[in-house]
């Protein structure tokens, strides 16, 4: 197994990572496994989750993939039960699922009055359903897994919840207002 970059021993702990098949969260999942945690990999694509679990297990870690829609409470609650039955109670929750939608973006970084007269997509043209999808994914998609897994953590010392955000929360980009606002 590769180096434990977390410099801590998580042996016996169960870590749950949403958005686990994504670029950042797959690295978080590997790091948690290298520190000794059993890792529940949550995401939409079981093929990618299985490949990541196989990679972690090839290094000597313990990982299982679970298909989960973080915007569906019943699904989150069921997956929380499944993880507890298979790996144990959640000690660490990493909320990493998130994203953007092209229908919630503008075409340009800066608004100019002439943009109203041409085909440029401005703030005034943003698609409401695209904006709602981004807010649901980035907010509800953190809320529901937290509700599902935090029940297993309440009253147990040493449990942690990490919510992955974005620098856009601090320095919003004008071209992606829904994403920046939801972070």
Range-by-range predicted roles:
Residues 14, 21-23:
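Conserved glycine-rich cofactor-binding loop
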Residues 37-51:
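Conserved glycine-rich Rossmann-like NAD(P)H-binding loop of the short-chain dehydrogenase/reductase
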Residues 46-47, 67-79, 128:
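The beta1-alpha1 cofactor-binding region of Rossmann-like NAD(H)/NADP(H)-dependent oxidoreductases
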Residues 96-119:
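Conserved NAD(P)H cofactor-binding loop of Rossmann-fold oxidoreductase domains
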Residues 112-143, 162:
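Catalytic Tyr-X3-Lys loop
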Residues 146, 182:
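Active-site helix of classical SDR
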Residues 166:
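Residue(s) in the substrate-gating loop at a strand-loop-helix junction
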Residues 172-180:
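Active-site loop-to-helix junction immediately N-terminal to the catalytic Tyr of the SDR YXXXK motif
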């Amino acid at each position: 197994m590769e180096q434990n970059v977390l410099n801590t021993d998580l042996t016996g702990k169960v870590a749950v990572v949403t958005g686990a098949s994504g670029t950042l969260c797959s690295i978080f999942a590997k790091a948690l496994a290298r520190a000794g945690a059993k890792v529940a990999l949550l995401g939409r694509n079981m093929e990618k989750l299985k490949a990541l679990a196989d990679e972690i297990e090839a290094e000597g870690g313990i990982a299982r993939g679970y298909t989960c829609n973080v915007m569906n409470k019943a699904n989150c609650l069921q997956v929380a039960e499944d993880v507890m039955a298979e790996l144990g109670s959640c000690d660490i929750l990493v909320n990493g699922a998130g994203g953007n939608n092209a229908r919630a973006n503008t075409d340009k970084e800066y608004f100019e009055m002439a943009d109203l007269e041409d085909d440029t997509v401005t703030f005034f043209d943003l698609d409401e359903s695209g904006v709602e999808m981004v807010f649901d994914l980035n907010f509800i998609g953190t809320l529901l897994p937290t509700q599902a897994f935090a029940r297993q953590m309440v009253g147990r010392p040493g449990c942690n919840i990490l919510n992955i955000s974005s620098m856009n929360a601090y320095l919003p980009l004008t071209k992606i207002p829904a994403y920046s606002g939801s972070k």
